Amino acid sequence: MKFFKNKKNEIQESKYFSINEIDIKIEKYLDFDNGFFVELGANDGVNQSNSLYFEKYRNWKGVLVEPIPHNYLLCKKNRSLNSKVF
């Protein structure tokens, strides 16, 4: 979970998940709904995810690939039916 202070100095939860705010940066280039993604190295499906924002807020579907068994199981648990996890 990421948090930030808004203009009123209140703490709010961010709707973005990616490390270094990559999802924020690429949104201006991928500014459409119902897209498709492929994410390699999906981790647990939430932390440092480059695709979760697009799935959760822009109705994208896609494929997540995670080679570490423990993270793979977390990813399957954490992501919706809109994503296929391998």
Model segments located where?
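SAM cofactor-binding core of SAM-dependent methyltransferases
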Residues: S14-F86
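Non-catalytic N-terminal targeting/anchoring module and adjacent flexible stem/linker
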Residues: M1-S14
